[in-house]
C-alpha cells in the first residue's frame, strides 16, 4: 500500500516536470505532496509530516506566483523524463523502508545522522539543478 503511494508521488513529480504551464505543474507538485504524506507520517514524529506539508505548500504558492509572473516560458523538450522517473524510483525507494525511525528534528543534532542530513542536502541541490534547467536559465525573479 505504501509502495503505491510512493509510485504515484514519483509519477506526479515527473508530470510536474513535463508540463510547461505553472498551474498544472504546481497541481502535480501538490498531488505528489499528498501522496508522500502517508509515508512521512509513519516515521517517528507525526508532527514532522505536518511541518513538511506547511513548508512545502507555502513554497509551492510562492513558486506559483513567481512562475505566473514570467512573461515568457521557454518550452524545453525533455526526452529523458521517463528515464529520470525510473531512476528516481530506484534511487529513493529503498530509503523509505531502511530509515523509518530516523526522521525527527532532534536526531539531526547527533553525529550518527549526519549522512541523513547530507542526503537531504544532496536531494535539494539535485532538485534545484533540475528546476534551473527546466526554467531555461531565465530565473523566476522579478525584473528591475
From Swiss-Prot:
Membrane-topology descriptor: Multi-pass membrane protein
Enzyme class: translocase
Top-level taxonomic group: Eukaryota
One GO term describing the cellular component: mitochondrial membrane
Keywords recorded for this protein, A-Z: Electron transport, Membrane, Mitochondrion, NAD, Respiratory chain, Translocase, Transmembrane, Transmembrane helix, Transport, Ubiquinone
Molecular function in Gene Ontology: NADH dehydrogenase (ubiquinone) activity
TM annotation in the entry: 1-21, 26-46, 47-67, 76-96, 108-128
Catalytic reaction equation(s): a ubiquinone + NADH + 5 H(+)(in) = a ubiquinol + NAD(+) + 4 H(+)(out)
EC numbers: 7.1.1.2
Cell location: Mitochondrion membrane
Function: Core subunit of the mitochondrial membrane respiratory chain NADH dehydrogenase (Complex I) that is believed to belong to the minimal assembly required for catalysis. Complex I functions in the transfer of electrons from NADH to the respiratory chain. The immediate electron acceptor for the enzyme is believed to be ubiquinone.
Family: Belongs to the complex I subunit 6 family.
Listed name of the protein: NADH-ubiquinone oxidoreductase chain 6
Protein species of origin: Ascaris suum (Pig roundworm)
UniProt lineage: Eukaryota, Metazoa, Ecdysozoa, Nematoda, Chromadorea
